Regions:
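A generic structural motif
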Residues: 59, 158-164
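Active-site-proximal beta-strand/loop segments in catalytic clefts of secreted hydrolases
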Residues: 10-11, 24-26, 90-92, 121-123, ...
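Short, solvent-exposed loop/turn segments at the edges of secondary structure
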Residues: 3, 17, 41, 83, ...
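Aromatic-acidic/polar surface patches that form glycan- and anion
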Residues: 57-61, 168-171
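Acidic/His- and Gly-rich active-site-bordering loop/insert found
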Residues: 1-58, 65, 75-82
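Acidic-enriched catalytic cores of C-N bond-cleaving enzymes acting on peptides and small amides
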Residues: 108-111, 116, 124-137, 142-151, ...
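Acidic/histidine-rich catalytic neighborhood of metal-dependent amide-processing enzymes
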Residues: 52-53, 59-141
Length: 216
């Protein structure tokens, strides 16, 4: 789809169930020219050594691409059937302009597909629960929501003139002020259902203040 994006469909047996989508991306961040010698193993070698696969993109995010494909192949090879249709979607330019993901989304929209859920990268590692006040507990964050974003285009019109006799400030100054106003107006912080559930689950393991008192 698009340039080199890939969309694989595994049909489900129950048409009443909305399909799910497992997503990742094939591309990786490039290696800066002149730094090739700084890598323990060649950046694109995929060397297997010391119990690890070495290379650019092994964690961002080739392991998820191969993990999803390996899991699907494993189940299908053993005759596993799916009640819910599953889509495996792999963009090819996530690190740059995301046209691959856009092409996949537009294709699914044109087909009238409404998804039950999307499983994407992020929060997929075991780490100490320090951020939750539970440093002695290991956690894996399951991210249930996605932050949105907005693109803003600001235009300023001002009276022309000479820098020696500015009239009412410069366009650049006014534009900078508008950008500063936006920066000083972040969205209000709120405790949503996902975070509430996380704290309720972790409450017995939280040992650090002030969270220890707040979750009791």
């Amino acid at each position: 789809i698009g340039h080199h994006a890939v969309l694989i469909t595994i049909p489900g047996s129950d048409a009443s169930l909305r399909p799910c989508l497992y997503m990742s991306h094939q591309d990786v961040v490039p290696v800066v020219e002149g730094t090739e010698q700084d890598w323990t193993h060649p950046a694109f070698s995929g060397d297997i050594a010391d119990g690890y696969i070495w290379g650019r993109g092994t964690l961002d995010i080739k392991e998820q691409v191969f993990g999803v494909l390996e899991a699907a192949e494993y189940l299908l090879a053993r005759g596993k059937s799916f009640a819910r249709t599953a889509y495996l979607a792999f963009g090819d330019d996530e690190e740059t302009i995301n046209l691959g993901a856009l092409a996949i989304a537009e294709h699914l929209k044109a087909q009238g597909v409404t998804l039950e859920f999307v499983l994407d990268e992020g929060g997929c590692k075991i780490e100490p629960g320090t951020a939750f006040g539970a440093p002695e507990t290991s956690i894996v964050s399951v991210q249930l929501m996605e932050k949105g974003y907005a693109d803003l285009e600001l235009s300023v019109h001002s009276i022309g003139g000479h820098s020696s006799r500015p009239y009412g400030g410069t366009s650049l100054g006014r534009l900078s002020g508008a950008i500063a106003d936006i920066t000083r107006a972040p969205f209000a912080v709120r405790l949503n259902s996902a975070m509430t559930g996380a704290f309720e689950t972790l409450a017995p393991y939280i040992t650090e203040e002030p969270l220890k008192t707040l979750v009791r």
